[in-house]
């Protein structure tokens, strides 16, 4: 109900519904794509945790990076570009824990750091980081003889 309400709020505020927006069943929402939701809509300011993709139109790369860096959340970002130099410069400027180039933010390997920034969370997950953070090392020295 929460995600459905956020979709409705965005559409009422001027977002265009490209696809979805309804329910597949009483418990499953359709994958939804919103075009240009208003900046003040909750779907633009908070992590959705639902099958929703919000797409925004920008004037230029500086505008896109400023908008992304102004968000309260900063888990992962994606940059799609034909020019790898442009993509890498954008990745360097984005304040996100991970930046995928020409790949969606669903990419993850077990050994990569898995972290949030700002309101997306603190600390780092992933197998190596979790083992380090969830265990205590102890050294035992045994003198023989």
Segments predicted by a language model, with ranges:
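Conserved C-terminal structural/oligomerization subdomain of aldehyde/semialdehyde dehydrogenase
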Residues: 12, 28-145
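Helical element adjacent to the flavin cofactor pocket in flavoenzyme catalytic cores
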Residues: 6-11
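Short secondary-structure junctions
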Residues: 12-23
């Amino acid at each position: 109900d929460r995600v459905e309400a956020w979709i409705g709020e965005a559409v009422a505020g001027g977002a265009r519904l490209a696809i979805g927006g309804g329910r597949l069943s009483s418990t499953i929402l359709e994958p939804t794509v919103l075009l240009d939701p208003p900046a003040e809509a909750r779907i633009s300011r908070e992590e959705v945790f639902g099958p929703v993709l919000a797409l925004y139109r920008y004037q230029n790369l500086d505008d896109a990076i400023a908008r992304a860096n102004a968000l309260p959340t900063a888990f992962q970002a994606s940059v799609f570009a034909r020019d790898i130099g442009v993509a890498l410069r954008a990745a360097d400027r984005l304040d996100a824990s991970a930046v995928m180039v020409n790949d969606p933010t669903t990419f993850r390997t077990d050994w990569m750091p898995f972290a949030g920034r700002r309101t997306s969370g603190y600390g780092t997950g992933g197998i190596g980081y979790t083992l380090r953070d969830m265990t205590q090392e102890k050294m035992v020295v045994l003198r023989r003889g």
